[in-house]
């Protein structure tokens, strides 16, 4: 190989690459599942569904101190371009059809992250409220839970790391068989009517006593 002159190095400081005959130096060999999982976990596009104070902590995770965009997470304004749904805050019965509709509009594969006690269990608003949904997993399947009231930004980053590990270990064939499909609510089927859990009997017994 002819050495380059000083003038050529100044104009083009990058020397041309040498092409070898070794296959490992020129071609990357990997499985299709590994390539697919690497692409998915490196480009998660979240869609935020925030209804309460937990969502404010999630906004802090996008600040310069944590910078969640370094994971390839670019927020999207429409569910049709997102593959990660993040719910934060209380989900009410009126919100349930809209939330399920947004989830159904997301393309496969899609993931759901429940953030905060109100989303996971209904929180303090579900104790005596017949309109609060006691857990978003009764409406849509959830992949990662972030407990807290509200959870800190460090917990959000830890959840993102766990979700990336889950995606990295997925298989295309296993996902079709293990994906949760049964839900209490869906677009073609109505919400199942169940007897109310809070009937006020404990209040009546307390007054009698």
Curated annotation (Swiss-Prot):
It comes from the Bacteria. Binds 1 [4Fe-4S] cluster. Pfam families: Oxidored_q6. It is found in: Cellular thylakoid membrane. GO terms for biological process: aerobic respiration; electron transport coupled proton transport; photosynthesis, light reaction. GO terms for molecular function: 4 iron, 4 sulfur cluster binding; iron ion binding; NADH dehydrogenase (ubiquinone) activity; quinone binding. PANTHER family: NADH DEHYDROGENASE (PTHR11995), NADH DEHYDROGENASE [UBIQUINONE] IRON-SULFUR PROTEIN 7, MITOCHONDRIAL (PTHR11995:SF14). NDH-1 can be composed of about 15 different subunits; different subcomplexes with different compositions have been identified which probably have different functions. NDH-1 shuttles electrons from an unknown electron donor, via FMN and iron-sulfur (Fe-S) centers, to quinones in the respiratory and/or the photosynthetic chain. The immediate electron acceptor for the enzyme in this species is believed to be plastoquinone. Couples the redox reaction to proton translocation, and thus conserves the redox energy in a proton gradient. Cyanobacterial NDH-1 also plays a role in inorganic carbon-concentration. This is NAD(P)H-quinone oxidoreductase subunit K 2. It comes from Acaryochloris marina (strain MBIC 11017). The lineage of its organism: Bacteria, Bacillati, Cyanobacteriota, Cyanophyceae, Acaryochloridales.
């Amino acid at each position: 190989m002819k050495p380059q002159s000083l003038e050529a190095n100044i104009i083009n400081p990058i020397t041309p690459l040498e092409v070898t005959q070794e296959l490992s130096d020129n071609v990357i060999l990997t499985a299709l599942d590994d390539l697919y999982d690497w692409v998915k976990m490196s480009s998660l596009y979240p869609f935020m569904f925030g209804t309460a104070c937990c969502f404010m902590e999630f906004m802090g995770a996008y600040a310069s101190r944590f910078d969640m965009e370094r994971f390839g997470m670019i927020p999207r304004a429409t569910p049709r371009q997102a593959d990660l749904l993040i719910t934060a805050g209380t989900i009410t019965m009126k919100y349930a059809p809209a939330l399920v509709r947004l989830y159904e509009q997301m393309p496969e594969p899609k993931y759901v992250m429940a953030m905060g006690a109100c989303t996971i269990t209904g929180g303090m608003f579900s104790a005596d409220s017949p309109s609060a949904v006691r857990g978003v997993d009764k409406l849509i399947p959830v992949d990662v839970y972030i407990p807290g009231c509200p959870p800190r930004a460090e917990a959000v980053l830890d959840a993102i790391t766990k979700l990336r590990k889950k995606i990295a270990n997925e298989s295309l064939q296993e996902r079709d068989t293990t994906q949760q499909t049964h839900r209490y609510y869906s677009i073609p089927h109505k919400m199942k009517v169940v007897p109310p859990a809070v009937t006020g009997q404990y209040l009546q017994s307390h007054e009698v006593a």
